[in-house]
Amino acid sequence: MPLGELEDEAMGKILLVGAEGPIRASLNEMMSAEDYKIEYAQSGFEAGIQAESLHPDAVVVDFAMGRNDALLIAANLRKNPEYAETVLIGLLSDEDNAAGFDRTIFNETFRKPFDGALLAERVRTLVGRKKQLV
């Protein structure tokens, strides 16, 4: 196995979808570049392309991109057996929180505003747990 593949397996891979600047900056600052590779997508189409190439351990979907788009991305990931074990985190506004929808599709949801350190810690914990099980 080439060394690059070993590094990829050891490194946590995170895909941020529709995330606003402050959230991106916060996660970049709090997640070690040696331990985590973070990629970004602004749309469902980009998310699909990035997911195919990155095979992320976690996908963080910001509902700021639109509730329907965010739910569609989450549903499509869950339908695909390749991403059955992918950790899925939703970032919700008060409006999204009040609007009823099935949250079981997500491993975790955060309501804005939230502490970026808490999000980073939960991502680390959930990705670490996933990697131990694989």
Residue ranges and their predicted role:
Residues 55-57, 81-88:
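His-Asp phosphorelay/catalytic-motif detector in bacterial-type signaling
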Residues 51, 60, 73-74, 83:
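Hydrophobic alpha-helical motif in two-component signaling modules
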Residues 21-39:
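Two-component/phosphorelay signaling modules centered on CheY-like receiver
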Residues 40-58:
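Acidic, metal-coordinating helix/loop segments flanking the phosphotransfer/catalytic sites
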Residues 21, 42-46, 117:
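Acidic phosphotransfer microenvironment of two-component signaling modules
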Residues 1-20, 115-134:
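Non-catalytic signal-transmission and effector/linker regions of two-component phosphorelay proteins
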Residues 72, 92-112, 117, 121:
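Alpha4 helix (beta4-alpha4-beta5 surface) of REC/receiver domains from two-component response regulators
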Residues 61-77:
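Conserved phosphotransfer microenvironments
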